[in-house]
């Protein structure tokens, strides 16, 4: 676990019910009933996204038979990133990963308080409910989905929408940091408070 505070000398993250848990998973496909989780990572930030702590980044073992069922996009993407090799070499099961991550999260946020945060996070939540139900119960039932802001910005402020360029690395930890950066981008450029009544620029 690494403190990735943006400012040198910034205080460590204090356990707080307002802290946010950011999560990303890589899967063999899109159907939680037939596909499996192959990587999971978490990052906890404070409520203002100024302080962050990285949690476990885990490749989850799956059989060669399961990996062989992936479509070409998944085989190519996860092959290029090295994830398929990491999955084959891993001895971590879904239950192992869920236990490690729950133990890490409990040190930074009370159970049932943080929404699940990320991009298109409902998809991760579907897989977690299917394959890691005990970890899914750690989260509040709400989601904080950066994709909501993305879709609104795309329709209401297309110039701002085009200003954030994703790296599309498709590894769990990199995708989390990109989601946090994307939310900061929308906060600074899209979520602009209106001036109080009667106040002019």
UniProtKB/Swiss-Prot annotation:
Q: Tell me the superkingdom of the source.
A: Bacteria
Q: Which GO terms describe its cellular component?
A: cytoplasm
Q: Name one GO biological process term.
A: DNA metabolic process
Keyword Cytoplasm appears in the UniProt entry:
yes
Pinpoint the Exonuclease domain residues: 20-183
By its UniProt entry, which Pfam families does this protein fall under? RNase_T (PF00929)
Q: Which GO terms describe its molecular function?
A: 3'-5'-RNA exonuclease activity; nucleic acid binding
Q: Which UniProt keywords apply?
A: Cytoplasm, Exonuclease, Hydrolase, Nuclease
Enumerate the active-site residues. Answer: 141
Record keywords: Disulfide bond included?
A: no
User: Where would you find this protein in the cell?
Assistant: Cytoplasm
Q: What is its EC number?
A: 3.1.15.-
Q: What class of enzyme is it?
A: hydrolase
Q: Which family does it belong to?
A: Belongs to the oligoribonuclease family.
Annotated function: 3'-to-5' exoribonuclease specific for small oligoribonucleotides.
Any idea what this protein is called? Oligoribonuclease
Instruction: Give the originating organism.
Output: Burkholderia pseudomallei (strain K96243)
